[in-house]
């Protein structure tokens, strides 16, 4: 057997494989908000909180807080985090450069309070 394979690199087959639906993608993202370290990563490493499109997207995702969508949520704490993020970003305004201002403390608050919120979430689950 030679060191180099004559087979092409792995490429997913388009036959029979479907991309996730918008519903599935949005559900997965909303539920990922229950993971405080992930939220911290998003906010601090990517500075995504400064993007007005992110603010609009989070606001749009609030429909998950309403029936009938809540029945699909496995990690209900994600809705708490979604509302928390939106409450911070509601105060932010877009400057002339297209960057949100007024929510500069958001990453720091998530970093400092995130551990406590995770503990509170666990306690609610035990409750």
UniProtKB/Swiss-Prot annotation:
One of its GO terms (cellular component) is core mediator complex. GO terms for biological process: DNA repair; meiotic gene conversion; positive regulation of transcription elongation by RNA polymerase II; positive regulation of transcription initiation by RNA polymerase II; regulation of transcription by RNA polymerase II; RNA polymerase II preinitiation complex assembly. Pfam families: Med31. It is found in: Nucleus. Coiled coil: none annotated. GO terms for molecular function: transcription coactivator activity. Keywords: Activator, Nucleus, Transcription, Transcription regulation. Belongs to the Mediator complex subunit 31 family. Component of the Mediator complex, a coactivator involved in the regulated transcription of nearly all RNA polymerase II-dependent genes. Mediator functions as a bridge to convey information from gene-specific regulatory proteins to the basal RNA polymerase II transcription machinery. Mediator is recruited to promoters by direct interactions with regulatory proteins and serves as a scaffold for the assembly of a functional preinitiation complex with RNA polymerase II and the general transcription factors. Component of the Mediator complex. This is Mediator of RNA polymerase II transcription subunit 31. It comes from Eremothecium gossypii (strain ATCC 10895 / CBS 109.51 / FGSC 9923 / NRRL Y-1056). The gene is SOH1.
């Amino acid at each position: 057997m030679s060191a180099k394979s004559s087979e092409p690199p792995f490429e997913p087959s388009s036959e029979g494989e479907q991309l996730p639906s918008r519903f599935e993608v949005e559900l997965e993202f909303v539920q990922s908000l229950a993971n405080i370290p992930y939220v911290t990563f998003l906010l601090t490493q990517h500075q995504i909180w400064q993007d007005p499109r992110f603010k609009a997207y989070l606001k749009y995702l609030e429909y998950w807080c309403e029936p009938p969508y809540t029945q699909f949520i496995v990690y209900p704490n994600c809705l708490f985090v979604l509302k928390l993020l939106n409450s911070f970003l509601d105060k932010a305004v877009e400057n002339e450069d297209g960057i949100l201002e007024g929510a500069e403390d958001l990453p720091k608050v998530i970093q400092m309070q995130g551990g406590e919120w995770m503990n509170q979430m666990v306690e609610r689950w035990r409750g």
